[in-house]
Amino acid sequence: MEARRSVDLSFQIVDRIHEILLAKGLKQKDLASMLGKSEAEISRWMRGTHNFTIDTLISIEHALGSPILKVVGKEETMPV
């Protein structure tokens, strides 16, 4: 069940990054350039199976100037 949740979250992150890129008129190659990464590496990330680190997500948020994640507060509960 945890593996399924991990994959679902990865796809949600990728969807959010795609949404931001589209809204800003950017492509994956632009993101690669902003992050100093190869287009191939960004392409692998965007397949939805990459295990994003917090540092990577922060770098992407900074490069795009838009939030990717929303941290759930204490009063909110996570579905089990």
Question: Where do the protein language model's features map onto the residues?
Answer:
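N-terminal flexible/basic segments that precede or flank functional cores
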Residues: M1-E19, K24
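Residues that mark the N-terminal boundary/hinge immediately upstream of a DNA-recognition element
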Residues: R16, K27, S38, T53-T56
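The alpha-helix within a helix-turn-helix
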Residues: L21, A32, E61
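Short alpha-helical DNA-recognition segment
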Residues: G25-S43
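DNA major-groove recognition helix of helix-turn-helix/homeodomain DNA-binding modules
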Residues: D55-K70
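Short, charged recognition helix plus adjacent turn
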Residues: V72-V80
